[in-house]
Amino acid sequence: MAEERVPVLETKCLGIQFGGLKAVNDVNIEIYPGELIGLIGPNGAGKTTIFNLITGIYKPTSGSYMLCGRRMNGLSTHQVVEAGIARTFQNIRLFKKMTVLENVMVAFNKDMKCNLFQSIFRTPFFWKEEAETAQKAMDLLKLFKLDGFADQLAENLPYGKQRLLEIARALATDMKLLLLDEPAAGMNPVETAELKESIKMLREKFRIPILLIEHDMSLVMSICERIYVLNFGEILASGKPEEIANNKDVIEAYLGKEDEDEEGGGNDAEG
Protein backbone atom coordinates (compact mmCIF):
# COMPACT_ATOMS: atom_id res chain seq x y z
CA MET A 1 0.00 0.00 0.00
CA ALA A 2 1.46 3.36 -1.05
CA GLU A 3 2.35 5.72 1.78
CA GLU A 4 0.17 8.84 1.84
CA ARG A 5 2.09 12.05 1.30
CA VAL A 6 1.56 14.75 3.89
CA PRO A 7 1.71 18.33 2.61
CA VAL A 8 4.33 20.57 4.17
CA LEU A 9 1.80 23.39 3.92
CA GLU A 10 -1.94 22.96 3.58
CA THR A 11 -4.49 25.76 3.76
CA LYS A 12 -8.15 24.81 4.06
CA CYS A 13 -10.75 27.44 3.09
CA LEU A 14 -8.36 30.06 4.51
CA GLY A 15 -9.75 33.57 4.72
CA ILE A 16 -9.64 36.93 6.44
CA GLN A 17 -12.15 39.73 6.54
CA PHE A 18 -11.40 43.38 7.35
CA GLY A 19 -14.73 44.95 8.23
CA GLY A 20 -16.98 44.17 5.29
CA LEU A 21 -14.08 43.38 2.93
CA LYS A 22 -13.11 39.78 2.30
CA ALA A 23 -9.42 40.26 1.53
CA VAL A 24 -8.80 36.51 1.23
CA ASN A 25 -11.61 34.00 0.84
CA ASP A 26 -11.78 30.20 0.73
CA VAL A 27 -8.13 29.68 -0.30
CA ASN A 28 -6.93 26.08 -0.58
CA ILE A 29 -3.21 25.54 -1.23
CA GLU A 30 -1.07 22.43 -0.88
CA ILE A 31 2.73 22.31 -1.02
CA TYR A 32 4.63 19.04 -0.80
CA PRO A 33 8.29 18.36 0.13
CA GLY A 34 10.75 19.83 -2.35
CA GLU A 35 8.15 21.68 -4.43
CA LEU A 36 8.60 25.20 -5.79
CA ILE A 37 5.15 26.74 -6.09
CA GLY A 38 4.23 30.12 -7.56
CA LEU A 39 1.52 32.43 -6.23
CA ILE A 40 0.63 35.11 -8.76
CA GLY A 41 -2.10 37.66 -9.29
CA PRO A 42 -2.73 41.36 -9.87
CA ASN A 43 -1.62 43.97 -7.35
CA GLY A 44 -4.06 43.93 -4.47
CA ALA A 45 -5.22 40.38 -5.15
CA GLY A 46 -4.29 39.28 -1.62
CA LYS A 47 -0.98 37.47 -2.17
CA THR A 48 0.98 39.16 0.61
CA THR A 49 -2.09 38.93 2.86
CA ILE A 50 -1.87 35.14 2.47
CA PHE A 51 1.80 35.28 3.50
CA ASN A 52 0.81 37.40 6.51
CA LEU A 53 -1.80 34.80 7.47
CA ILE A 54 0.64 31.91 7.13
CA THR A 55 3.30 33.68 9.21
CA GLY A 56 0.99 34.73 12.04
CA ILE A 57 0.98 38.47 11.35
CA TYR A 58 -2.75 38.24 10.63
CA LYS A 59 -5.16 35.79 12.26
CA PRO A 60 -7.58 33.98 9.92
CA THR A 61 -11.26 34.80 10.35
CA SER A 62 -12.16 31.60 8.51
CA GLY A 63 -10.51 28.33 7.59
CA SER A 64 -7.22 26.93 8.82
CA TYR A 65 -3.69 26.09 7.80
CA MET A 66 -1.32 23.31 8.75
CA LEU A 67 2.45 22.81 8.66
CA CYS A 68 3.46 19.16 8.31
CA GLY A 69 0.11 18.13 9.77
CA ARG A 70 0.24 20.58 12.71
CA ARG A 71 -2.56 23.12 12.98
CA MET A 72 -1.04 26.62 13.02
CA ASN A 73 -4.06 28.87 13.65
CA GLY A 74 -3.53 31.25 16.54
CA LEU A 75 0.26 30.96 16.78
CA SER A 76 2.30 34.14 17.20
CA THR A 77 4.88 35.16 14.61
CA HIS A 78 7.81 33.87 16.69
CA GLN A 79 6.00 30.57 17.27
CA VAL A 80 5.50 30.24 13.52
CA VAL A 81 9.23 30.79 12.97
CA GLU A 82 10.06 28.22 15.64
CA ALA A 83 7.68 25.77 13.93
CA GLY A 84 9.69 26.12 10.73
CA ILE A 85 8.25 28.82 8.45
CA ALA A 86 10.64 31.50 7.20
CA ARG A 87 9.94 34.38 4.83
CA THR A 88 11.42 37.32 3.03
CA PHE A 89 9.58 40.60 2.47
CA GLN A 90 8.85 42.88 -0.48
CA ASN A 91 10.89 45.55 1.28
CA ILE A 92 14.28 44.21 2.33
CA ARG A 93 14.56 43.86 6.11
CA LEU A 94 18.19 43.46 7.07
CA PHE A 95 20.14 44.73 10.06
CA LYS A 96 21.81 47.34 7.90
CA LYS A 97 24.34 48.54 10.49
CA MET A 98 25.56 45.00 11.09
CA THR A 99 27.95 43.13 8.84
CA VAL A 100 26.83 40.60 6.27
CA LEU A 101 28.23 37.80 8.46
CA GLU A 102 26.52 39.12 11.60
CA ASN A 103 23.16 39.25 9.80
CA VAL A 104 23.31 35.50 9.25
CA MET A 105 24.79 34.72 12.68
CA VAL A 106 21.79 36.38 14.35
CA ALA A 107 19.50 33.79 12.77
CA PHE A 108 21.46 31.00 14.48
CA ASN A 109 20.88 32.48 17.97
CA LYS A 110 18.08 30.04 18.78
CA ASP A 111 20.60 27.18 18.46
CA MET A 112 23.14 28.70 20.86
CA LYS A 113 23.36 27.11 24.30
CA CYS A 114 25.48 29.55 26.32
CA ASN A 115 23.66 31.25 29.20
CA LEU A 116 23.55 34.89 30.25
CA PHE A 117 26.55 34.55 32.59
CA GLN A 118 28.68 32.97 29.87
CA SER A 119 27.65 35.67 27.39
CA ILE A 120 28.37 38.59 29.72
CA PHE A 121 31.74 37.32 30.91
CA ARG A 122 32.80 35.92 27.54
CA THR A 123 33.75 32.50 28.86
CA PRO A 124 35.70 29.97 26.75
CA PHE A 125 32.43 28.18 26.01
CA PHE A 126 30.96 31.44 24.68
CA TRP A 127 33.91 31.99 22.32
CA LYS A 128 33.74 28.38 21.17
CA GLU A 129 30.06 28.72 20.28
CA GLU A 130 30.65 32.10 18.68
CA ALA A 131 33.34 30.62 16.42
CA GLU A 132 31.15 27.66 15.48
CA THR A 133 28.23 29.96 14.65
CA ALA A 134 30.46 32.22 12.56
CA GLN A 135 31.64 29.20 10.58
CA LYS A 136 28.08 28.00 9.94
CA ALA A 137 27.13 31.50 8.81
CA MET A 138 30.16 31.70 6.53
CA ASP A 139 29.26 28.34 4.98
CA LEU A 140 25.84 29.74 4.08
CA LEU A 141 27.36 32.90 2.65
CA LYS A 142 29.57 30.78 0.42
CA LEU A 143 26.51 29.03 -1.02
CA PHE A 144 25.20 32.41 -2.16
CA LYS A 145 28.67 33.68 -3.17
CA LEU A 146 28.50 36.34 -0.47
CA ASP A 147 31.51 35.22 1.57
CA GLY A 148 33.65 37.92 -0.05
CA PHE A 149 31.34 40.54 1.47
CA ALA A 150 31.26 39.00 4.98
CA ASP A 151 32.86 41.97 6.77
CA GLN A 152 30.96 44.67 4.89
CA LEU A 153 27.96 46.42 6.39
CA ALA A 154 24.75 45.00 4.95
CA GLU A 155 23.64 48.46 3.82
CA ASN A 156 26.68 48.70 1.54
CA LEU A 157 25.80 45.60 -0.46
CA PRO A 158 24.39 46.01 -3.97
CA TYR A 159 20.62 45.64 -4.04
CA GLY A 160 20.63 42.17 -5.58
CA LYS A 161 23.15 40.93 -3.01
CA GLN A 162 20.97 42.26 -0.19
CA ARG A 163 18.14 40.11 -1.51
CA LEU A 164 20.39 37.05 -1.51
CA LEU A 165 21.56 37.86 2.03
CA GLU A 166 17.95 37.96 3.18
CA ILE A 167 17.39 34.47 1.74
CA ALA A 168 20.63 33.18 3.31
CA ARG A 169 19.53 34.50 6.70
CA ALA A 170 16.14 32.80 6.31
CA LEU A 171 17.92 29.54 5.52
CA ALA A 172 19.80 29.80 8.83
CA THR A 173 16.53 29.38 10.74
CA ASP A 174 16.44 25.69 9.75
CA MET A 175 13.03 26.12 8.18
CA LYS A 176 10.60 23.56 6.80
CA LEU A 177 9.02 26.05 4.38
CA LEU A 178 10.36 29.20 2.74
CA LEU A 179 8.09 32.04 1.61
CA LEU A 180 9.61 34.46 -0.91
CA ASP A 181 7.67 37.70 -1.40
CA GLU A 182 8.62 39.29 -4.73
CA PRO A 183 12.36 38.59 -4.41
CA ALA A 184 13.07 39.85 -7.95
CA ALA A 185 11.37 43.22 -7.41
CA GLY A 186 13.71 46.05 -8.39
CA MET A 187 16.39 43.74 -9.77
CA ASN A 188 18.14 44.17 -13.09
CA PRO A 189 18.34 41.20 -15.50
CA VAL A 190 21.77 40.11 -14.23
CA GLU A 191 20.61 40.15 -10.60
CA THR A 192 17.42 38.28 -11.53
CA ALA A 193 19.45 35.57 -13.26
CA GLU A 194 21.63 35.26 -10.15
CA LEU A 195 18.51 35.01 -7.97
CA LYS A 196 17.10 32.29 -10.23
CA GLU A 197 20.26 30.21 -9.90
CA SER A 198 20.25 30.66 -6.11
CA ILE A 199 16.65 29.47 -5.83
CA LYS A 200 17.43 26.46 -8.02
CA MET A 201 20.46 25.73 -5.82
CA LEU A 202 18.27 25.81 -2.70
CA ARG A 203 15.91 23.24 -4.16
CA GLU A 204 18.64 20.93 -5.40
CA LYS A 205 20.80 21.06 -2.27
CA PHE A 206 18.24 21.29 0.52
CA ARG A 207 14.94 20.19 -1.07
CA ILE A 208 13.23 23.02 0.80
CA PRO A 209 9.65 23.62 -0.33
CA ILE A 210 9.23 27.21 -1.52
CA LEU A 211 6.14 29.37 -2.06
CA LEU A 212 7.03 32.25 -4.37
CA ILE A 213 5.12 35.49 -4.95
CA GLU A 214 6.49 37.17 -8.04
CA HIS A 215 5.42 39.52 -10.84
CA ASP A 216 8.29 38.51 -13.14
CA MET A 217 6.38 35.97 -15.22
CA SER A 218 9.43 34.69 -17.06
CA LEU A 219 11.00 33.80 -13.71
CA VAL A 220 7.83 32.16 -12.37
CA MET A 221 7.17 30.17 -15.53
CA SER A 222 10.76 28.93 -15.75
CA ILE A 223 11.26 27.62 -12.20
CA CYS A 224 7.85 26.80 -10.67
CA GLU A 225 6.34 23.32 -10.88
CA ARG A 226 2.83 24.50 -10.13
CA ILE A 227 1.21 27.91 -9.94
CA TYR A 228 -1.78 29.26 -8.04
CA VAL A 229 -3.46 32.35 -9.50
CA LEU A 230 -5.17 34.69 -7.05
CA ASN A 231 -7.78 37.25 -8.09
CA PHE A 232 -9.88 39.37 -5.72
CA GLY A 233 -8.71 37.23 -2.81
CA GLU A 234 -9.78 33.91 -4.30
CA ILE A 235 -8.01 31.16 -6.24
CA LEU A 236 -8.87 31.69 -9.90
CA ALA A 237 -6.83 28.79 -11.28
CA SER A 238 -4.02 26.39 -10.44
CA GLY A 239 -1.87 24.09 -12.50
CA LYS A 240 1.42 23.65 -14.30
CA PRO A 241 3.04 26.73 -15.88
CA GLU A 242 1.95 25.82 -19.41
CA GLU A 243 -1.63 25.31 -18.22
CA ILE A 244 -1.68 28.69 -16.49
CA ALA A 245 -0.12 30.45 -19.48
CA ASN A 246 -2.93 29.17 -21.72
CA ASN A 247 -5.80 29.63 -19.28
CA LYS A 248 -8.20 32.22 -20.74
CA ASP A 249 -9.47 33.34 -17.34
CA VAL A 250 -5.92 33.94 -16.16
CA ILE A 251 -4.98 35.79 -19.33
CA GLU A 252 -7.93 38.15 -18.87
CA ALA A 253 -7.51 38.65 -15.14
CA TYR A 254 -3.75 38.89 -14.81
CA LEU A 255 -1.45 38.20 -17.70
CA GLY A 256 -3.36 40.73 -19.75
CA LYS A 257 -5.61 40.50 -22.76
CA GLU A 258 -3.08 42.55 -24.70
CA ASP A 259 -3.21 43.02 -28.44
CA GLU A 260 -4.90 39.69 -29.02
CA ASP A 261 -5.77 40.64 -32.56
CA GLU A 262 -2.19 41.59 -33.40
CA GLU A 263 -0.21 39.15 -31.30
CA GLY A 264 -2.55 36.25 -30.67
CA GLY A 265 -3.29 37.18 -27.06
CA GLY A 266 0.24 37.58 -25.69
CA ASN A 267 0.61 36.29 -22.14
CA ASP A 268 3.83 37.88 -21.00
CA ALA A 269 2.48 40.97 -19.24
CA GLU A 270 3.94 41.60 -15.80
CA GLY A 271 0.60 42.29 -14.15
Give the role of each language-model region:
Residues A2-G271:
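Glycine-rich phosphate-binding loops of nucleotide-dependent enzymes
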